[in-house]
């Protein structure tokens, strides 16, 4: 089921997911998220309250953060969209600037429905 989450929520969930993949146990610190997203720790704390209340994370204030199954699914979905968009821009439209590709895909990924992602996957697999 597709749910239109706020872009900021998705960015935080994606950041937590990517950071947690590099850590044993998957627990992430507020400061790591702040550094990853280049925001103030107080901004992270504010968002963590929202994510916790919406059931996306398990959070022990002043300790660490872990994604719930729900949070992990949203993060993985965003990353799949990003991956297919990059393939499309790189292989079909022949855009080569990785920095620009990252910037474009990070903006668009939040507006792609599951149906569009599936269509992109199909297009990418048939034309590449």
Question: Where do the model's predicted regions map?
Answer:
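A short, conserved structural fragment
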Residues: 52-62
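N-terminal helix-turn-helix DNA-binding core of bacterial DNA-binding proteins
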Residues: 3-39
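C-terminal regulatory/oligomerization modules of transcriptional regulators
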Residues: 103-128
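Arg/Lys-rich, alpha-helical DNA-contact motif
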Residues: 79-111
């Amino acid at each position: 089921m597709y749910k239109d989450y706020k872009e900021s929520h998705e960015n935080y969930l994606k950041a937590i997911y990517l950071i947690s993949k590099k850590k044993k146990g998957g627990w992430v610190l507020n400061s790591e998220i702040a550094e990853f997203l280049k925001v103030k720790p107080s901004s992270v704390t504010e968002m963590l309250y929202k994510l916790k209340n919406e059931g996306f994370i398990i959070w022990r204030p002043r300790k660490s953060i872990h994604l719930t199954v729900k949070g992990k699914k949203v993060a993985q979905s965003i990353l799949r969209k990003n991956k297919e968009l990059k393939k499309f821009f790189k292989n079909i439209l022949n855009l080569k600037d990785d920095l620009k590709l990252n910037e474009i895909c990070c903006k668009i990924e939040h507006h792609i429905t599951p149906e569009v992602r599936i269509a992109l996957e199909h297009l990418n697999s048939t034309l590449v």
